[in-house]
């Protein structure tokens, strides 16, 4: 592959040419301050993210999946977002899939040459049976990773909504995707180390995207996380607290409703606020496509 000297993310940072000579306090301050630029880059990408959220919510309402694709740090960040959807929003695990160049072993160590294989990118999309109802999120700091670009092309050809996240303007990945999310973070404090603010920007963008999608899919009531899956003691207490906050019920009533709803915060809230039993609350929620507001009329 020819050396690419034009990518913003590969340029030496002009403010930190003497980084190795910094005292420890200055070094830490420089690294921390540069991370703040990641959040600003995501804010600038707001319109594209909003477009991605609207398009994704529409497909997911019809039963589609979220498919995350990337190599190295970008792939691991996609995997992280995918696995957090189930405990946070009770999103079905089978509807969140992460494809990482090099497969599962690339989670723990670099797999030589994996990101350079266009064939593997296209093959992984085919093996996942990606189709028109799916939303495919493709991440690459450079925006030119062959595995990820080929996956984008294959997913788009299959009719999926493709959303590309890259940290360099004019990146091939952005051109290959239906929705282009440019996270223009510029040079890194450590030249070319895109696990720093480029990766941070990708993480913030994924947090923003998936959280906004779940709000649109009625996984949040007010600003309360009402579709949380109470899978440990901490989350059991959170479910109780959320039920009390949303319904105004006391602890005993909230506990009784949660017991009757088998731990479903949404169901318990509708039961308490509407004064109905669990089957009736479930029917109301189903008719309202999971919306508590809709179920309460």
What is the predicted function of each stretch?
Residues 67-205, 213-217:
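Glycine-rich phosphate-binding loops that contact phosphosugars or nucleotide phosphates
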Residues 1-41:
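Cofactor-/ligand-binding subdomain signature composed of acidic, glycine-rich
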Residues 34-44, 110, 135-138:
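Short, basic, glycine/proline-bearing loop/turn elements
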């Amino acid at each position: 592959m020819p050396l690419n000297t034009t990518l913003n993310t590969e340029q030496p940072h002009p403010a930190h040419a003497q980084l190795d000579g910094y005292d420890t306090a200055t070094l830490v301050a420089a690294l921390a301050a540069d991370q703040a630029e990641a959040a600003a880059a995501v804010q600038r990408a707001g319109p594209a993210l909003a477009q991605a959220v609207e398009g994704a919510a529409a497909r997911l309402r019809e039963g589609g999946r979220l498919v995350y694709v990337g190599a190295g740090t970008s792939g691991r960040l996609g995997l992280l977002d995918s696995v957090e959807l189930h405990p946070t929003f009770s999103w079905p695990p089978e509807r969140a899939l992460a494809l990482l160049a090099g497969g599962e072993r690339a989670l723990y160590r670099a797999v030589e040459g994996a990101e350079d294989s266009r064939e593997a990118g296209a093959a992984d999309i085919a093996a996942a049976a990606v189709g028109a109802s799916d939303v495919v999120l493709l991440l690459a700091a450079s925006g030119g990773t062959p595995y990820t670009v080929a996956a984008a092309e294959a997913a788009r050809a299959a009719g999926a909504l493709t959303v590309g996240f890259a940290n360099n303007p004019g990146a091939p990945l952005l051109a290959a995707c239906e929705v282009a999310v440019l996270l223009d973070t510029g040079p890194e404090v450590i030249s070319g180390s895109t696990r720093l603010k480029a990766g941070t920007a990708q993480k913030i963008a994924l947090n923003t995207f998936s959280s906004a999608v779940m709000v649109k899919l009625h996984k949040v009531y007010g600003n309360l996380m009402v579709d949380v899956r109470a899978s440990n003691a901490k989350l059991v207490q959170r479910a109780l607290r959320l039920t009390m906050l949303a319904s105004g019920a006391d602890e005993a009533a909230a506990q009784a409703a949660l017991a009757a709803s088998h731990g479903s915060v949404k169901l318990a809230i509708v039961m308490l606020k509407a004064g109905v039993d669990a089957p009736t609350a479930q029917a109301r929620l189903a008719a309202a496509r999971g919306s508590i507001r809709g179920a309460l009329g």
